[in-house]
Amino acid sequence: MSLTPNHRPVLVVDYGAQYAQLIARRVREAGIYSEVIPHTATPQEIQEKNPVALVLSGGPSSVYAEDAPGIDPDILKLGLPVFGICYGFQAMTHALGGKVAATGKREYGRTDLEVKGGVLHDGLELSHKVWMSHGDAVSEAPEGFTVTASSEAAPVAAFENVEAKMAGVQYHPEVLHSPHGQQVLTRFLTEIAGLEQNWTAANIAEELVEKIREQVGPEGRAICGLSGGVDSAVAAALVQRAIGDRLTCVFVDHGLLRAGEREQVEKDFVAATGAKLVTVDERKAFLDKLAGVTEPEAKRKAIGAEFIRSFERAVAGVLEDSPEGSTVDFLVQGTLYPDVVESGGGAGTANIKSHHNVGGLPDDVEFELVEPLRLLFKDEVRAVGRELGLPEVIVARQPFPGPGLGIRIIGEVTEERLETLRHADLIARTELTAAGLDGIIWQCPVVLLADVRSVGVQGDGRTYGHPIVLRPVSSEDAMTADWTRLPYEVLERISTRITNEVADVNRVVLDVTSKPPGTIEWE
């Protein structure tokens, strides 16, 4: 199941931009529901979604390239408000009869925008910074459009036709590097397109509960695996709100957990929801399946497959205590929108890696999936959790991958290596919390390079220990991320404690890679 809201969407047409999903998120931040569709969508397919407006995303192509994705002119004749961004701005111009030129001047990064009036930039400084990323530029606006901004390399950096409810900008209003970008996007949606801002956490929760009731039916029973994270907790809380005690939550202790995690789930979630919880100990089964497995994708698949097998065993146990003839047909998953995107869930997207909530399920899975969060971003999930009354200890928890520490050990997963990583992870989390840094870090994976040995000096002799990698990142939604600039004294305390207290570790290193190009998790 995925959320099909009672809201007509703003459709973000994806031209291959890394920020297409971020645009959709910004539209929702403006209080309006949005979805992403591929640029290959036909006018008929667009009409079937009954949208209220279109936003054309950026993309890497030139409108003059032989295989450049364009926009069907018939789409622009549907009578919908249209907003073009970067490449979408140029494609829109081209389709409407304006001119796009290869000026030979490129603009990448922060750029001065010169405002010449109009609705989009009304009240903003006449010269302010925006984030540009383009080679070609619009040299002449289509007939009926007013040029409202320019830059050094883009004579037409923004235009609008208020009567036709169409506008566009050459820069990227969706990124934080364009300080007034959210205001500009909201102006288009509300003042030019005339849309109502009615997308809130309260109505998201209400609609989700109703959709779950429709899918599961009046007698259907569901099972939900709790990981201890916010996604599974909110998904379970929604389903329980919808079907009550026909939901059984199962916490699989697969041995890949962080220190104290099992106890936290058994205490915090049950106290907050009163849900039925069954805990099963499957540590040996998972370690047996992972024995000798070192390839990251193989590990993910093995963990996903064994998780379902563990679930089936748990279901059998639940059914033993149920009325004769009862079955459990529905499996609740906390899949999020970025999960689907990263797993190649849309046309034109590359399959980066098999996501732990999407691609690891075996073909013979016996459950019908209930995925109430599938079209939500992380901030929306937290908002729904608060709306449902879940405590901050759950909704504010940093993300943790479904495969757990299994994908934070580079190499074979063994009990000894898990204990090493678990100890190092606890030290890092304890020090970050003590320093008051939890609020600025999206998450901080701690990674054990188990197949690497580095030379060190500890005590009176040389050692050959494993390196530990700290990967603190800051992000809004996990689609893009930057490494967090932690205070040196905090890094020093973490490093000193890990090398002093964790056996067989003699080096701590800091990962300073952004996403892209690197993903947040190492595997």
Curated annotation (Swiss-Prot):
Chain ranges of the Glutamine amidotransferase type-1 domain: 9-198
Annotated EC: 6.3.5.2
Domain of life: Bacteria
Binding residue positions for ATP: S227, G228, G229, V230, D231, S232, A233
Catalytic activity: XMP + L-glutamine + ATP + H2O = GMP + L-glutamate + AMP + diphosphate + 2 H(+)
Cross-referenced InterPro entries: Class_I_gatase-like, GATASE, GMP_synth_C, GMP_synth_GATase, GMP_synthase, GMPS_ATP_PPase_dom, NAD/GMP_synthase, Rossmann-like_a/b/a_fold
Coiled-coil features, chain-numbered ranges: none
Disulfide bonds: none
Described purpose of this protein according to its UniProt entry: Catalyzes the synthesis of GMP from XMP.
Name by which UniProt lists this protein: GMP synthase [glutamine-hydrolyzing]
Organism, as annotated: Corynebacterium efficiens (strain DSM 44549 / YS-314 / AJ 12310 / JCM 11189 / NBRC 100395)
Upper taxonomic lineage: Bacteria, Bacillati, Actinomycetota, Actinomycetes, Mycobacteriales
Encoding gene per record: guaA
